[in-house]
Amino acid sequence: MKTTDDFFIPDNEIRLVKELDYSCVNEYIDSAEAFSRASYQSVYIIDYFKHNFLYVSPNPMFLCGLSPEHVKELGYRFYLDCVPENEQSLLLMLNKAGFSFYNELPVIDRKKWYISYDFHILNDGRKILVNHKLTPLALTSDGRIWLALCVVSAATHTDAGHIEMHRADSSEYYVYNVVSRKWHKREMPMLTSGEKSVLSLSIQGYTMAEIAEKNMSVTRYDKKISPTHLR
C-alpha cells in the first residue's frame, strides 16, 4: 500500500536545514496568491522539508470539491485520496525520474526548469484529466528544492502521462519514456507568422470559421497545428 512517505526520496531530501529561512515564506505565498487572482489555474506551494503544502489557492480546478484549507491539511495525502489508484504509481515514477534528472543539472540553472505531466483527479467519483507543472521556487545552496510552485490546468491530451522537462529559455525539452525509463531530447517546432496568428485567434476564443474570415490563408496552417489548440 502506498504512503505519503513514498514521495520523499534521497533525491529530494533537504540536507542543509540551517539554510531554511521560514521568515520569508509569506513573500512566496503573497506572490502565489497574486498569480492565483489573475489566473483560472490552480496554484499551490510544496514544502519539501516539512513534507506538506505551504499554500493552496481557492481556484477550483485542483480542489476536487474540497476547500483550500482541507487540501492544504491533506498535503501529500491528497494524491492518495484524490488520484485514481492505478495512476499513483505513475506519480511516484515521475517523481523519482524528475528529481534524478533535476539533480544532474548545474545548480545555477535549476530554477529555469519545470516538469510537466498529466494525471486524473477524482471529483465526486468523476475522473478529470489535469496538467500539472512544477518548478523550483526556493533552493538551498546545494541546489535542493526547498519550496516548489505547482500550477494545475486542464490537460490538452486525452490520457495520463506525457512527462516532459522544459527549460524556460530553450526550445529543447526532454520527454520521459515510461517503458524504457529514459529521457529523450526533443525540439519544439518553430511556428510561422501565419501559424502564430491562427493560434493567437484561437486562444482569444475564435472558431475556425471566424478565424478563416479574418485570415483567408488559414487552411495552409491548420493541418500543421495540433487540433487541441483549435476549439
How would you describe each model-predicted region?
Residues 1-20:
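Short, low-complexity N-terminal regulatory "tails/caps" that precede and couple sensory modules
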Residues 16, 90-94, 231:
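Short, structured secondary-structure boundary patches
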Residues 19, 85, 185, 189:
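Charge-dense, low-complexity intrinsically disordered segments
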Residues 20-78, 169-183:
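PAS-family sensory domain signal
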Residues 32-34, 108, 187-188:
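Short, flexible, glycine/charge-rich loop motifs used to bind or transfer phosphoryl groups or to couple energy/partner
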Residues 46-69, 74-161:
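Sensory/regulatory domains in signal-transduction proteins
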Residues 178-231:
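Helix-turn-helix DNA-binding segment
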